């Protein structure tokens, strides 16, 4: 094989109005290299992949794969035939084997004809069996079922037209992996995957013999799969050899040289780096330490010391001893039982990470806690001092014609944030919208910027109990880190639905895990501790993803 599978020479990309989002990038990609692409939202990461996939040809410089290199590309919004079933879409990836198996059955049937040309049939049979043998075709159904379980695909006979965006992405990813290209270009492959499916994908790509270039904000994924980090910074492509943790070390050293203008970002990075360096045991004690520090977090002096953090979660009223108690909760939709006899209580200072497959009922729990829906039976009791602040995962309700400042402030110079008042521009600035950025139209924002704006809008009520539904979606790593630090310093409680394992390990004091047939488990500890507990009590197979099973309600 050639020394490089893909080369880029002085590649640049200009977007209106004459802005260079990529400039003068020269890179060569080794066979089998695993590269994670990092950069702020809007840095040009998706553009880079579209160029490499040959979709965006309006560029400066040259970008080309070596001859005969087969490239597979997963965009953020993949296109599938809406008339196909899930099974038909997946079988497109292995059509050569599917067709060979069908034709082989026909050849066997033709042997029954006494006038058949047996020599010709035998030759065709041999050719077909070679194809099937080369791809382990006789085990094709087993391969497809295993992949469908791992990525929690919908039922085989489900129509693509009826699937959600997340379900379509999982089908497209499954199909792409089964195609086995020489080079995989993956734009946010972990989006819409739960933690167990991400872990499976991680192992798959680690063992994949081809080259992988992946845009992802999943830092365990970057730690466990990537051998290189490509950082896009102000149009330039900066390669770093090593995984995410080693990149963090190098980045810290680099920012030390740019200390004055990078002071806030460096402070945030150093907090995460301190956590990385502690190792597993030190990390696991963090959750307990947070609970023990709850009184300090509540103090006015402590809150004032943290007013310079990059992202700000306004504190609510002081929490009393009772926060949330759930007793014998049961909830169903139609004939599907989502929650069966769930009981738990949350102590002061807890941050509960909620995990489980999509569609298992995680958001439904939030709607019951906030009173938007009622349980079938059981009780949810909030403490008298609890004030809820909810952030849902839907960010389409914002007015695209308004500026960032107008969307949050409603045009007011002074805003009420919880029980206090503050200048609206100062509040918006606490979500990293500085200066001219506050004048940007909402419709011009990247996914990550919309995420920050969404947080700024919904957190201004100043709650002491946060319900955060997929707050990490579309956030770049800088903002993820800032959100983690803000949650760790928040003087209240939070329940957070997330599939980001690094995020859950840094912030969670407890885990609520949605499993099969309405079972939900409550565990004290972070995500890694919970995985170790499951492996210890249920065996390694318990960590393998499977398509979710709903318990049927007896009629």
Swiss-Prot record:
ATP 2 binds at residues 356-363. Residues 95-139 are annotated as: Arm. It is an enzyme of class 3 (hydrolase). Residues 242-322 are annotated as: PtIM. It catalyses: ATP + H2O = ADP + phosphate + H(+). Residues 6-259, 324-550 form the ABC transporter domain. The keyword ATP-binding applies. It is found in: Cytoplasm. Induction: Constitutively expressed, increases in stationary phase (at protein level). Pfam families: ABC_tran, ABC_tran_Xtn. The arm domain (residues 95-139) is inserted in the first ABC transporter domain. When deleted impairs fitness in long-term (up to 6 days) growth in stationary phase. Probably contacts ribosomal protein L1. The P-site tRNA interaction motif (PtIM domain, residues 242-322) probably interacts with the P-site tRNA(fMet) as well as the 23S rRNA. Monomer at concentrations found in vivo, exists in a slowly reversible monomer-homodimer equilibrium. Probably contacts ribosomal proteins L1, L5, L33 and S7, the 16S and 23S rRNA and the P-site containing tRNA(fMet). A translation factor that gates the progression of the 70S ribosomal initiation complex (IC, containing tRNA(fMet) in the P-site) into the translation elongation cycle by using a mechanism sensitive to the ATP/ADP ratio. Binds to the 70S ribosome E-site where it modulates the state of the translating ribosome during subunit translocation. Belongs to the ABC transporter superfamily. ABCF family. Translational throttle EttA subfamily. NCBIfam families: ABC_ABC_ChvD, PRK11819.1. This is Energy-dependent translational throttle protein EttA. It comes from Escherichia coli (strain K12).
